[in-house]
Design a protein with these regions (language model features):
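Glycine-centered loop/turn motifs
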Residues: 264-266
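Outer-membrane beta-barrel and related beta-rich outer-membrane complex signature
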Residues: 48-52, 96-104, 197-199
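Short, well-ordered, mixed-charge alpha-helical segments that flank or form enzyme active sites
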Residues: 92-97, 154-157
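Acidic/glycine-enriched edge-of-secondary-structure segments
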Residues: 119, 205-206
Length: 329
């Protein structure tokens, strides 16, 4: 990722930076139906604007010049309809932990806020830990449910204790065909314990406290064939802190067109409101065009605007651009 932004109070915040994130996924199956997944990861995004706040990009990772274990979990079936995942380094949205994202936006993960599929309050992606989860599919109905528990510091404070930083997420998910297109929908609930807010304005972070209930609704539709009609994705989440009377809300709507000008390329844009309290203000917008240079190389120029970056009506207006290049092997 190479880019810069303006609107910050310090020169470092507006510096042009070049950052990398590299991942090596090792997947082993013992029965043909199970999967042991381990991911080695390294990156140099921090400290930079791409590694913090509302300008955080989905690929941002800082490893301090070393290679770290990004994932280590085992997924296996139980009967015909249930899939279970367990491991010491797992996240709430990993395979067998989460039924699915009700979104078709974006095809290339960019600003982190827009990658949650509207479910930022029920799918905490800030960290990994020791976890257990399962996904149950109701036959061919298109419906599935999932539930999981992740203890961020399970190796030190333990699992299931009052001091443990943890999240527990539950989801009802649907996938089917509607109006000659593909339709996704989800409703989610989560409880976070001793965990700060993953993303949001300054006031939202202060109001969130450490313990809170989260709720989310999201839906998305995509045409069966590429054309003038884009995919449409939208979602809303609310967080209800235990120690505050202020609820936290956020929403987004994203549009994406496939095979724009050239097959394999896509164009997309999204607008939304980062998690905020009632007397707060924030608006976010991004636009991108993804070039498929080859089957294994994509280049995605992106431009974004964040109105009220801090969300405290301080008139901080941030805009920026970057180019994300992805190589897959």
């Amino acid at each position: 990722v190479a880019g810069a932004a303006e609107g910050f109070d310090n020169d470092e915040g507006e510096a042009f930076t070049v950052n990398y994130d590299i991942r090596l996924a090792l997947k082993t199956s013992f029965t043909g139906k199970d999967m042991l997944t381990s991911v080695l990861r390294a990156g140099n995004f921090g400290p930079s604007i791409w590694d913090e706040g509302l300008t955080f990009v989905e690929t941002a990772m800082s490893s301090g010049g070393s290679v770290k274990i990004g994932r280590l979990f085992y997924t296996f079936p139980v009967g015909e309809n249930l899939t279970v995942t367990a491991g010491p380094v797992v996240r709430t949205d990993d395979a067998g932990m989460y039924a699915g994202y009700a979104t078709f936006y974006p095809s290339d993960l960019l600003l982190d806020f827009f990658t949650y599929g509207g479910a930022w309050a029920t799918n905490n992606l800030a960290s990994t830990g020791a976890g257990l989860g399962g996904v149950y599919k109701f036959g061919d109905s298109g419906f599935s449910v999932s539930g999981n528990y992740v203890a961020w510091d399970g190796s030190s404070t333990g699992i299931g204790r009052d001091e443990t930083g943890s999240t527990s997420s539950w989801q009802l998910f649907y996938e089917g065909e509607v109006f000659d297109g593909n339709f996704l929908a989800q409703a989610g609930y989560a409880y976070a314990q001793n965990v700060g807010l993953t993303i949001g304005t300054n006031k939202a972070g202060a109001a969130a406290g450490d313990n809170r209930h989260g709720y989310s609704l999201a839906a998305a539709w995509a045409p069966a064939d590429a054309g003038l009609i884009p995919s449409i994705s939208g979602g809303w989440s609310m967080s209800d802190p235990d120690d505050s009377d202020e609820d936290i809300h956020g929403w987004y709507v994203g549009l994406e067109w496939s095979d724009v000008f050239v097959e394999g390329n896509s164009f997309g844009t999204a607008i939304g409101q980062a998690p905020k309290v009632e007397d707060d203000y924030n608006k976010m917008w991004e636009i991108f065009y993804k070039f498929a240079v080859t089957d294994n190389i994509t280049v995605t120029p992106t431009y974004f605007i964040i109105d009220e970056y801090s969300g405290d009506l301080s008139s901080d207006y941030v805009q920026g651009a970057y180019v994300k290049t992805t190589f897959t092997f």
